[in-house]
Every structure is written in C-alpha cells, then in structure tokens.
C-alpha cells in the first residue's frame, strides 16, 4: 500500500452504490406493480438485492475500520457529523407526519363531523398496550446506555448482556405493535385518522426494526472483539439512533395516542 501523508480515508471504488440504486429502482417499481397487478415478485427481488447490498457494504466498512485502520480520528469525526445530519433529516421526516396529524386534528373539517377523533372512529386506549410499549422503549433506552457504559469501562460481559436485553426489548415492542395493528378497530383506509395513525406509527415501527438490526450487528461485533473502550463508533451511532427512536415514540404517544384520543 502506498504511503499517504494525510489522515483521511480515500475510499476504494465500490459496486455497492450501484447495486443499492438498482435495489431502490426495483423496490419502487415493485411497489407500483404490487398495487396495480398484485404481484410481489419485483418487490421481493428489490428487497433481496437491498439486503445483500447492506450486508456487503457494512462488511467492507467493518473491514476498513476494524482491521485496516482507515477510521482515524478525523475520519471518525466525519462519520459522527454524517450520523448527526442523518438523524436531523429523520427528525424532519417525522415532522411531516406530525404536521399532517395536527393540521387535521386541531381544526377538524365538517367532513370529519367537526370533531376529533372523527365520527365513527373508536380510538385505542392510550393506557393499555401503548403505555406498555412506552415503558418497553424507555427501558430499552436505559439498557443501551448501560451497554455503552460497560463498553467504555472495558466490561465486555456487561456490554453483551445489556445489548442482548436491548434487542429483546426492541423485538418485544415490535411484537406488541403488530398485535395492536391486528386488533385495531380501524384501518389505514378509515379517513385521515386511520392514515395519519398507521403511517406515523408504522414508519416509527420500521425505524425500531432498523434500530434492532443495527444493535444486533453491534452485538455480533462485540462478541467478535471488534470494539474497544476507545474505538466503538459503530455502537455509538446505533445508540444515538435508538435514543432518537425513543424520543419520537414519546411524541407519538403524547400526540396521537393520548391527546388524539
């Protein structure tokens, strides 16, 4: 390898942006075909290609950062800024859903019966499954912080236990949310209430699944001795993302489940 006189990582040519873009094209085309022709083949093909791209790309980044030493302090600083900007973009993504909800609920139109929830909608009790989900996510926020402290103190066993517990709580939250959707007395087609409810909570649920996957990768890396008390940005990014998911849920719970009911 040629000597470089700077601390920055000059990335090698990679096929993964191309395969990722192809997967995105297949998924959007597949979604349209599923809606109009009831065929899932193209959508599944796109999802499979996306999954393979993610696995291969993450594998390359882990190799570069863990085994090849390319993630120097300036590179880590750039990755931190990148993750912060990504989370900020996600905040604005959810802001659109909250805007739609409050736009519809603060001044209900005559078509909705002039009230919120709209006439004919039987909302979910905020003090049953939604409250349990809130407790589960808050507990997972505590366990992921516990894992971070264990990692920083070099307590490998404690970090593994806390991370495992966090993933279990994430999976439990997803299972409770799926049960709630299955038993909900309204659907996504039931006017603006059903649409805002299922789109906002559904996208949050998708983020919980992504966050749980992110943490599962971190758990595997921790088991394989990839992290040290000084060098563990992959875990830090996962923890930031998980805390963001927690905070979004609190706003969803207070707005849609509690105030909106």
Swiss-Prot record:
Swiss-Prot/TrEMBL keywords: Membrane, Mitochondrion, Mitochondrion inner membrane, Translocase, Transmembrane, Transmembrane helix
Catalytic activity from the UniProt record: 4 Fe(II)-[cytochrome c] + O2 + 8 H(+)(in) = 4 Fe(III)-[cytochrome c] + 2 H2O + 4 H(+)(out)
Mitochondrial intermembrane side: 35-40, 106-128, 184-190, 257-261
MF term (GO), any: cytochrome-c oxidase activity
Gene Ontology BP term (one): mitochondrial electron transport, cytochrome c to oxygen
InterPro entries reported in the protein's UniProt record: Cyt_c/ubiquinol_Oxase_su3 (IPR024791), Cyt_c_oxase_su3_dom (IPR033945), Cyt_c_oxidase-like_su3 (IPR000298), Cyt_c_oxidase_su3-like_sf (IPR035973), Cyt_c_oxidase_su3_a-hlx (IPR013833)
Ranges per topology, Mitochondrial matrix: 1-15, 67-72, 153-155, 224-232
Subcellular location: Mitochondrion inner membrane
Pfam families recorded: COX3
Topology in membrane: Multi-pass membrane protein
Keyword Transmembrane helix: yes
GO cellular component, one term: respiratory chain complex IV
EC number in record: 7.1.1.9
Parts of the chain that traverse the membrane: 16-34, 41-66, 73-105, 129-152, 156-183, 191-223, 233-256
Complex and partners: Component of the cytochrome c oxidase (complex IV, CIV), a multisubunit enzyme composed of 14 subunits. The complex is composed of a catalytic core of 3 subunits MT-CO1, MT-CO2 and MT-CO3, encoded in the mitochondrial DNA, and 11 supernumerary subunits COX4I, COX5A, COX5B, COX6A, COX6B, COX6C, COX7A, COX7B, COX7C, COX8 and NDUFA4, which are encoded in the nuclear genome.
Protein family per UniProt: Belongs to the cytochrome c oxidase subunit 3 family.
Role noted for this protein: Component of the cytochrome c oxidase, the last enzyme in the mitochondrial electron transport chain which drives oxidative phosphorylation. The respiratory chain contains 3 multisubunit complexes succinate dehydrogenase (complex II, CII), ubiquinol-cytochrome c oxidoreductase (cytochrome b-c1 complex, complex III, CIII) and cytochrome c oxidase (complex IV, CIV), that cooperate to transfer electrons derived from NADH and succinate to molecular oxygen, creating an electrochemical gradient over the inner membrane that drives transmembrane transport and the ATP synthase.
PANTHER family registered for this protein in UniProt: CYTOCHROME C OXIDASE SUBUNIT 3, CYTOCHROME C OXIDASE SUBUNIT III
Protein name: Cytochrome c oxidase subunit 3
Gene field: MT-CO3
């Amino acid at each position: 390898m040629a000597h470089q006189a700077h601390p920055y990582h000059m990335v090698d040519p990679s096929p993964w942006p191309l395969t990722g873009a192809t997967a995105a094209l297949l998924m959007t085309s597949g979604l349209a075909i599923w809606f109009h022709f009831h065929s899932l083949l193209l959508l599944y093909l796109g999802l499979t290609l996306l999954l393979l791209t993610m696995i291969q790309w993450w594998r390359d980044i882990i190799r570069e950062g863990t085994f090849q030493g390319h993630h120097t302090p300036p590179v880590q600083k750039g990755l931190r800024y990148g993750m912060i900007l990504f989370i900020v973009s996600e905040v604005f993504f959810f802001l659109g859903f909250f805007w739609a909800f409050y736009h519809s609920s603060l001044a209900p139109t005559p078509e909705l019966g002039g009230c919120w929830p709209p006439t004919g909608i039987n909302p979910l009790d905020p003090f049953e499954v939604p409250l349990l989900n809130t407790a589960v996510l808050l507990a997972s926020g505590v366990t992921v912080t516990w894992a971070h402290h264990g990692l920083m103190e070099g307590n490998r066993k404690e970090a593994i236990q806390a991370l495992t517990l966090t993933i279990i709580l994430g999976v439990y939250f997803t299972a409770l949310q799926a049960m709630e959707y299955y038993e909900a007395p309204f659907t996504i087609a039931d006017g603006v209430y059903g649409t805002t409810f299922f789109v906002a909570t559904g996208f949050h649920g998708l983020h919980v699944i992504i966050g749980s996957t992110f943490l599962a990768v971190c758990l595997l890396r921790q088991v394989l001795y990839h992290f040290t008390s000084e060098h563990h940005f992959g875990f830090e990014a996962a923890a930031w993302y998980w805390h963001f998911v927690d905070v979004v849920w609190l706003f969803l719970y207070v707005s849609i489940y509690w105030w909106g009911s």
